[in-house]
Amino acid sequence: MMEETTDNTGTISSQKNVAASGHNHHHRYKYISNYGVGRRFLFFASCFGFYAFVAATYAWFVFPPHIGRTDHVSSSSLGCREDNEGSWSIGVFYGDSPFSLKPIETRNVWRNESGAWPVTNPVITCASFTNSGLPSNFLADPFLYVQGDTLYLFFETKSPITMQGDIGAAKSIDKGATWEPLGIALDEAWHLSFPFVFNYNGEIYMMPESNEIGQLNLYRAVNFPLSWKLEKVILKKPLVDSTIVHHEGIYWLIGSDHTGFGAKKNGQLEIWYSSSPLGTWKPHKKNPIYNGKRSIGARNGGRAFLYDGSLYRVGQDCGENYGKRIRVSKIEVLSKEEYREVEVPFSLEASRKGKNSWNGVRQHHFDVKQLSSGEFIGLVDGDRVTSGDLFHRVILGYASLAAAISVVILLGFLLGVVNCIVPSTWCMNYYAGKRTDALLNLETAGLFSEKLRRIGSRLNRVPPFLRGFVKPNSSMGKFTLGVIVILGLLLTCVGVRYIYGGSGAVEPYPFKGHLSQFTLATMTYDARLWNLKMYVKRYSRCPSVKEIVVIWNKGPPPDLSELDSAVPVRIRVQKQNSLNNRFEIDPLIKTRAVLELDDDIMMPCDDIEKGFRVWREHPERLVGFYPRFVDQTMTYSAEKFARSHKGYNMILTGAAFMDVRFAFDMYQSDKAKLGRVFVDEQFNCEDILLNFLYANASGSGKAVEYVRPSLVTIDTSKFSGVAISGNTNQHYRKRSKCLRRFSDLYGSLVDRRWEFGGRKDGWDL
């Protein structure tokens, strides 16, 4: 009995030792495993934190939150938000016929009260409607109703609250140059669009699209233009973009039904007829008239119109994208048994500015009327983005961020922080409870089949293979790691740009509801032709540039075919190489504003649009981007001197807006003659002279105004050997001499000083 007890005791003791050893072994591996998890967590937290910091910094510089859009929709407003359907707005065109229409800016219509010299399209936008207290994301489908010399406009306005279309109304008493938003004419519980308005038996009717409820409604004006009553349901079909035309004693209803079996969306068209627009409607014998390609213009794009005895139907080409362009077809046969039409040439003046133009990407609706004067007016909606652009950008943005995350994981593989893709215990049962450096540390033994374990084992060979291939400790390996880090940063910034950066379009800044245009002028000569080519290609795409005038001072001028321009370019060859040519009176300039911009300055179009917007507030001022401060020493200094004195009293005209008549007449006056002579002697300082002339003309008022350019502005004169400012010291000495000379002639600027940061929008910080 004693021996048996002893043996049992020894066995029990041995078992306890093994258990204790196993217990310590378990805790040791648990500690190591926790260490691995902590290391991985620290690595990924550091990487993602660094990338997030870079993304936030990039967003702050590129989309600065402290700088707003003056006289646009504020960031707190509900209106003008990005919409996946687009950013439609409405422009006006004039001509002697519906086939010779030109945009309003070609008529050179000026409006002093809104600083529009000239007025330019679009004439009514989501901003003008939203700022009147009627939030809207976009305006589309314009229809005109003419009462004498008063024009009423009805259109779809996309509500940012309900995210559905309502029918808005506006009025013009100056032939469409200015529009007063009146309000919402029709608001139902369902989506409304395409407000076809017409007169019948002394009553005004509206037939908007309401296909969402499966029927076509007809409304009658109770108190025109904002009060309407449902008259009747004229057709129990979900027709879209329907219009009525009276032809040979019969009323014809033309629209599309995309819900029918086999119907081709945006490629289908039907016709119905009746003795009255109130019904009853009967289907055409050949229905559907069209049911095929979306590019043929089957879907209506506006009201059918009569011109020169012929009837025309407006359609929209949806081949490349919804509402890509307008097509017009001449109706040759329209009877109860037959319908035949043939497409005719039709084009509205298209911009080459792409997204930077309000209608540069698509136009899908056209309505034309003849005014009492005999001329024709056409209303057109246009968009700078394609349908679905917002969704597309968001997808690309998050895909870029996902790729950046993948780059971080790849770094983890290469640096040995992550040793395998799946936990080793998913691959082999006997690793249960041991340390793992897997990307996904979810250890569960016995849950996976042998095939999945083999797949996991193969995947886990990838990290060691990559480390062996790249060799992170070698020089080439370190270079590769650096490239991968930079790639991750680029992907992060690209993702932020896609998600928060908008469509990439540069939009102009309206002032009191109007947009306008300016002439861009630059002075150059043959040795700087390469500068000029870049200059024209870049700035001709800015939204508000109407024309580029090249002041050619020396050498044979280039052929216009050498310049890639989206706007007309005019080369003015000078007889004498003089800096005074910059401000020579030019009667061919049609805009009031001129931007004098040197050909060696490269800045974003958005900066230029801001400067133009500021100048429109104060056209009597010289508005520019490069401030200088002149003190009692009369020593010319760079911008940092003005910053150190927290103010400026001069703006360089190498990048400045001015009133072409006021500035050029003043510069060429007899009073400025001695100054011009000194400019020719020094071959310098024409911009300084103009500042002195502005100061004299302004009296005690503010003569110049600064607009801060972005950080990406580049002065290419630093890389050129032909700039007059190449030798900085000599250049500054000449300009100091000019300051003293012009002070003697025109008085000092010393007692003038305007501080930075005076604008609420932050554009002059």
From Swiss-Prot:
Signal peptide region: none
Known role: Glycosyltransferase that mediates the glycosylation of glycosylinositol phosphorylceramides (GIPCs), the major sphingolipids in the plasma membrane; acts as a HexN(Ac)-specific GIPC sugar transferase and accepts glucosamine (GlcN) and N-acetylglucosamine (GlcNAc) as the sugar unit. Responsible for the glycosylation of a subgroup of GIPCs found in seeds and pollen that contain GlcNAc and GlcN (GlcN(Ac)). Maybe involved in the maintenance of cell-cell adhesion.
Tissue: Specifically and highly expressed in developing embryos and mature seeds. Also detected at low levels in stigma and pollen.
Cross-referenced PANTHER family: ACETYLGLUCOSAMINYLTRANSFERASE, GLYCOSYLTRANSFERASE FAMILY PROTEIN
Its membrane topology: Multi-pass membrane protein
Gene deletion effect: Loss of the GlcN(Ac) glycosylinositol phosphorylceramides (GIPCs) leading to a reduced sensitivity to abiotic stress (e.g. abscisic acid and salt) on seed germination. Reduced HexNAc-GIPC content. Slightly larger seeds with more seed storage lipids and proteins and larger seed coat cells.
Name of this protein: Glucosamine inositolphosphorylceramide transferase 1
UniProt-listed GO biological process terms: lipid glycosylation; protein glycosylation; response to abscisic acid; response to salt stress; seed germination
Induction, as annotated: Highly expressed in dry seed but drastically down-regulated after seed imbibition.
Sites where the protein binds Mn(2+): 600
Cofactor: Mn(2+)
Active site residues per record: 687
The keyword Plastid is annotated on this UniProt entry: no
Family: Belongs to the glycosyltransferase 64 family.
Transmembrane segments: 43-63, 394-414, 476-496
Cellular localisation: Membrane
Reactions that this protein is recorded to catalyse: an N-(2R-hydroxy-very-long-chain fatty acyl)-(R)-4-hydroxysphingoid base + a 1,2-diacyl-sn-glycero-3-phospho-(1D-myo-inositol) = a 1D-myo-inositol-1-phospho-N-[(R)-2-hydroxy-very-long-chain fatty acyl]-(R)-4-hydroxysphingoid base + a 1,2-diacyl-sn-glycerol
Organism domain of life: Eukaryota
Metabolic or biological pathway, per its Swiss-Prot or TrEMBL entry: Sphingolipid metabolism
Keyword Protein transport listed: no
Keyword tags: Disulfide bond, Manganese, Membrane, Metal-binding, Transferase, Transmembrane, Transmembrane helix
GO molecular function, one term: inositol phosphoceramide synthase activity
Organism: Arabidopsis thaliana
Positions annotated to bind substrate: 553, 577-582, 598-600, 628, 683-687
Disulfide bonding pattern of the chain: 685-738
The protein's Enzyme Commission number: 2.7.1.227
